[in-house]
């Protein structure tokens, strides 16, 4: 599935909830995606029917990891995460928006 907007994500999750699907939400920088990241996403997906992944924007990555980061540009990080088996939806957001997104989606699992 391509990277989605917030409105597209909310609509999709609303349909998934109507179909009684369990939702997991994971959020991270994913700058230089490693096997630990992939395993964490797989673990989250194993606990739910749908996995939403929030890829943090460049400002959030820089604030968390320091100057010179991110190494991988945002669009590539989002596309790489989208390619991980089991990821259903990818959204890009600022760190401050993750809690608001969680309120909107009310995930059953937060990873």
Over which residues does each language-model region extend?
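Nucleotidyltransferase catalytic core that binds NTPs
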Residues: 1-111
